[in-house]
Amino acid sequence: MSAPKRVLLLDTGNEWGGGTNSMFELLKRIDRTRFDVTCCFYKDYKKGQSGRLLSEELADIGIPLILLPIRKQPLWAKLAKEVARGLLSWSGRLKKRAVLAIEMEWRIKPRVAALTLLLEEGSYDLLYMNNQPSSNLEGYLAAEAAGLPVVQHCRIEPTLQAAETLRSANRP
């Protein structure tokens, strides 16, 4: 029998919701002889206001958790986004593109680098993303850089806004 496929499950969410619940149902039922799953989050949040931590719940079902550091938004990025919103208020499309360009520099590109390194060093076979496509841009770009396929879990029919997300999501 071959070794199980190594899967990195990326969740970019900030709170426990329906996506987290469906993720747990998948993880409880997945065939562990075929899939070796490690979860990757940015935040170890609680289940509800006074519930247990995500890390505790995952440990109970034997799933490892990797927490990637969250970088605080630098002042230059906050100011640049506000200036872009003000100057480009006449064009929603240009305003969104400018804000995305700023987000790419301070938040998304560093996350892509960290995820790419994690995917390569962990010898993963697949990146599974548990949030909507528009919030998973770093996952698409990291998987592409690492040469890995992606599974995107969508609980609703997504509307992709950013051209970069659309190009990444629709690659063969």
Please state what every model-predicted region is:
Residues 12, 70, 131-132, 154-158:
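Histidine-centered beta-alpha loop that forms part of the nucleotide-sugar donor binding/catalytic region
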Residues 12-16, 29-99:
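N-terminal strand-loop element at the rim of the active site
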Residues 63, 146-149:
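A short helix->loop->beta-strand "cap" motif at the edges of active sites that frequently abuts
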Residues 148-167:
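A short, histidine- and acid-enriched strand-loop-helix "catalytic/donor-clamping" loop
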Residues 8, 36-38, 151:
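A structural signal for isolated positions on well-ordered beta-strands in alpha/beta enzyme cores
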Residues 2-17, 22-25, 41-43:
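Nucleotide-activated donor-dependent transferases that construct or modify glycoconjugates
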